[in-house]
């Protein structure tokens, strides 16, 4: 039996991290990075308590892993003044993301999955236009600006150092596989936990080093997001579907 790959998950207590821990358990060995909220985990999981803003600790956390799923993000902006939240984005989504990519390079990590966001192309959505992986970023807020930096950094590390980098533009992710039968705003941007985990697995198992941007969204979003490249890049198609408008 082939030895299982070791996967470092940053932001492992978050919604996406929790979904990966649930659906990818048994397929990968986990090293889980938590900031301060540590949930109940399995005994075989490796635990790291740290902050992605600490470069030396990120280099240490990435030692000996095959891949990294970088899911750590700035907390919700609700309740924070704009200037303070923007500084949080710089610290987490810009400085922290640089630390992860550089730690991957230093340790010879082969693959990085970067939790990006449809916020990068949010202005296209506002204008009723189709968002594609190729269009020029038009972030709807400073969070989207931070994510655009991460994608550009991932492209740089692929081109210069040969890392496989997959930027998943995660859309509406409540970490559930259950869809209300009644349509609600945001359901046409919905990504199921199952689809998210399977997309991550497809990225981890892709055979050749490459850079890719993929919209993480389940079926029913065709008028907003172009996900046609996901099948060619990593062999992924969503299985689940959000509720349709009446």
Please tell me what each predicted stretch does:
Residues 7-27:
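N-terminal Rossmann NAD(P)H-binding glycine-rich loop of SDR-like oxidoreductase domains
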Residues 38-39, 45, 49-92:
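NAD(P)H-binding glycine-rich loop region in Rossmannoid oxidoreductase-like domains
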Residues 53, 88-99, 145-146, 191:
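Glycine-rich NAD(P)-binding loop of the Rossmann-fold in SDR/ketoreductase-type enzymes
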Residues 87, 91, 128-165:
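Catalytic helix-loop patch of NAD(P)-dependent Rossmann-fold dehydrogenases
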Residues 99-138:
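Conserved Rossmann-fold NAD(P)-dependent oxidoreductase catalytic core, especially the SDR/UDP-sugar
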Residues 212-214, 219-237:
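Conserved C-terminal active-site "lid" loop/helix of NAD(P)H-dependent oxidoreductases
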